[in-house]
């Protein structure tokens, strides 16, 4: 079973079902527009919900993913969204991508490119942050 937090119109869920139609998938997004206009094939599996308070029991999914979504949060909301993703995952099987940079040039590109992100950090700051809040899932960087 797979959960996509910040699924938008469900494109990734659709791809998972193309790989294996027997996969059990679910997706949430804060955008009513995105959910209303989701791909027909995944509409039964998506709903409007908040990443900071996922409407699923503990350990509900074999894998929970969130691709370039948590950058929309900061402070306590960022922490809550990451720990919620981990809470609904079995054996801490969660995967996220976050906006990151490794040097000043990448930071400038990131700031120019992503005008809506609330949280962008150096890769080392992200690692420290994950450790401090107890996030144990997998992660990868989006670096423009």
PLM region spans:
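Short catalytic micro-motifs in class I SAM-dependent methyltransferases
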Residues: 68-72
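Conserved helix-to-beta-strand junction in the class I
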Residues: 84-90
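A conserved beta-strand element that flanks and buttresses the S-adenosyl-L-methionine
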Residues: 65
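Class I (Rossmann-like) S-adenosyl-L-methionine-dependent methyltransferase catalytic domain
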Residues: 1, 5-53, 73-80, 94-144
């Amino acid at each position: 079973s797979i959960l996509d937090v910040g699924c938008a119109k469900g494109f990734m869920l659709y791809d998972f079902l193309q790989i294996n139609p027997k996969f059990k998938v679910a997706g949430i997004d804060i955008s009513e527009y995105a959910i209303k206009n989701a791909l027909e094939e995944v509409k039964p599996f998506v709903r409007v919900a908040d990443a900071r308070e996922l409407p699923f029991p503990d350990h509900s999914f074999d894998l929970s993913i969130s691709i370039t979504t948590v950058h929309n949060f900061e402070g306590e909301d960022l922490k809550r969204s990451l720990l919620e993703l981990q809470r609904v995952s079995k054996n801490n099987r969660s995967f996220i991508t976050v906006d990151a940079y490794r040097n000043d040039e990448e930071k400038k590109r990131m700031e120019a490119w992503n005008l809506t992100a609330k949280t962008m950090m150096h890769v080392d700051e992200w690692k420290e942050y994950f450790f401090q809040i107890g996030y144990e899932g997998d992660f990868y960087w989006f670096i423009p």
